[in-house]
């Protein structure tokens, strides 16, 4: 992948494998940084006819333990067959202003490979109702007051403040449309005006 790739206002759904796959291979080395902004990933790993396919991650942000500072921000992952957001062993990915909801595996899983330093960034993230508790155990400093992670039963921040579906305008997906401002989800997973990180 060459330099300067940026996805803005894109949707990936019902792909046989992952929605976004930013995999780097040991054989070929690191790919260039990719920025994913105001994007949506849902129902990946599940074809539109109901058959399952590959891994089924929403946003896969790396691979083979190779560090690339890919950025994911202002984006949403829901209903993916595996994880909503995964570093896939990239120890340097950046995740900001992201909602990950009701994915079959982890909503958020950030981990590396080998003994290299973990340099993840995780800010203003909401994770609710994942298939398992979010995985940030390799860099516990990611747990902050402005990040709400799913522990398998509830979503809370570093202080222990809990949130639930009530922070959203709606949790019923009714499709999407494209507008000049991005993707309109008709209130689905939109934060209410009175919610403050």
PLM regions: where:
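Right-handed parallel beta-helix
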Residues: 1-16, 30-48, 68-83, 92-104, ...
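Acidic-enriched, low-complexity/disordered segments with a strong bias for Aspartate over Glutamate
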Residues: 17-21, 49, 55, 64, ...
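Acidic, glycine- and Ser/Thr-rich low-complexity intrinsically disordered tracts
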Residues: 115-197
């Amino acid at each position: 992948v060459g330099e300067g790739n940026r996805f803005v206002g894109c949707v990936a759904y019902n792909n046989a494998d992952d929605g976004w796959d930013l995999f780097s291979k040991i054989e070929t080395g690191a790919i260039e940084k990719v920025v994913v902004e105001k994007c949506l990933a849902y129902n990946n790993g599940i074809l539109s006819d109901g058959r399952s396919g590959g891994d089924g991650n929403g946003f896969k942000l790396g691979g083979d333990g190779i560090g690339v500072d890919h950025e994911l921000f202002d984006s949403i992952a829901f209903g993916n067959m595996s994880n909503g957001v995964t570093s896939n062993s990239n120890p340097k990915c950046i995740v900001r202003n992201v909602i990950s909801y009701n994915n079959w595996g982890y909503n958020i899983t950030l981990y590396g490979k080998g003994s290299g330093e973990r340099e993840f960034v995780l800010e203003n993230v909401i994770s609710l109702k994942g298939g398992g508790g979010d995985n940030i155990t390799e860099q516990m400093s990611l747990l902050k007051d402005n990040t709400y992670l799913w522990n398998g039963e509830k979503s809370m921040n570093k202080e222990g403040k809990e949130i639930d579906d009530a922070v959203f305008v709606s949790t019923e997906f009714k499709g999407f449309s494209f507008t000049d401002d991005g993707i309109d989800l008709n209130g689905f997973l939109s934060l209410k005006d009175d919610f403050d990180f």
